[in-house]
């Protein structure tokens, strides 16, 4: 099996070098990173921080695993205090927290269903209460239900996807923006699924 294909010819290149590993697809949303074998790499130990984010506070949604965990660890390495939100992946979130704190940074781990506007406001409020600032908001959480055809997408799936991947980003930004100072950053992410 191969990972999702980031570009044409990727699978052929993997086969040429004998690169294979077990399937990483999980039926549940969100997935559980601790079940993946081999586990994804979230940081490069050869990279040293330079303190570029010292004194800053960041909120990374979906920060328990994947891209979110990698961002959380990179920001901590650069000196930021890091808050992560996640839905229900408690074990993954605890591991991210452990790794952020191992870098000597403050951390906050917040379970939240960000499909609800009130949860977005509560999450941002908790970050402001803990760190007394929010300099970087990374909207990274998402669901991805890959379907072969638009005809296979039901109303519930469509609604859940829009609530999670679009409306919640709006709610988070709306909650965070009044407390963010000039020069702060709002970042949104996507994954390879957008290109399949």
Language-model-detected regions and their locations in the chain:
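Catalytic loop of short-chain dehydrogenase/reductase
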Residues: 142-143, 185-196
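Conserved mid-core segment of classical short-chain dehydrogenase/reductases
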Residues: 6, 20-21, 116, 121, ...
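Canonical Rossmann dinucleotide-binding motif of NAD(H)/NADP(H)-dependent dehydrogenases/reductases
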Residues: 51-83
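Conserved glycine-rich Rossmann-like NAD(P)H-binding loop of the short-chain dehydrogenase/reductase
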Residues: 80-95
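Rossmann-fold scaffold of SDR-type NAD(P)-dependent oxidoreductases
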Residues: 61, 134-142, 165, 188
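Non-catalytic terminal and boundary segments that flank Rossmann-like NAD(P)-dependent oxidoreductase
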Residues: 1-54, 183
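Catalytic Tyr-X3-Lys loop
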Residues: 151-170, 187
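Amphipathic alpha-helical dimer-interface segment in Rossmann-like NAD(P)H-dependent oxidoreductases
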Residues: 73-74, 125, 129, 164-184, ...
């Amino acid at each position: 099996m191969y990972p999702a294909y980031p570009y044409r010819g990727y699978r052929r290149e993997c086969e040429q070098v004998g690169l294979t590993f077990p399937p990483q697809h999980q039926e549940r949303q969100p997935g559980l990173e601790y079940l993946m074998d081999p586990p994804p790499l979230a940081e490069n130990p050869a990279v040293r921080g330079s303190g570029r984010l010292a004194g800053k506070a960041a909120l990374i949604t979906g920060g328990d695993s994947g891209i979110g965990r990698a961002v959380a660890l990179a920001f901590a390495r650069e000196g930021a205090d890091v808050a992560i939100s996640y839905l229900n992946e408690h074990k993954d979130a605890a591991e991210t927290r452990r790794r952020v704190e191992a870098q000597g940074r403050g951390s906050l781990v917040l379970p939240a269903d960000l499909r609800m506007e009130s949860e977005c406001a509560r999450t941002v409020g908790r970050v402001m209460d803990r760190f007394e600032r929010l300099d970087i908001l990374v909207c990274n959480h998402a669901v991805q239900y890959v379907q072969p055809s638009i005809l296979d997408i039901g109303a519930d799936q469509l609604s859940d996807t829009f609530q999670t991947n679009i409306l919640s980003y709006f709610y988070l930004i709306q909650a965070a923006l009044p407390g963010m100072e000039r020069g702060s950053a709002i970042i949104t992410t996507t994954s390879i699924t957008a290109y399949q």
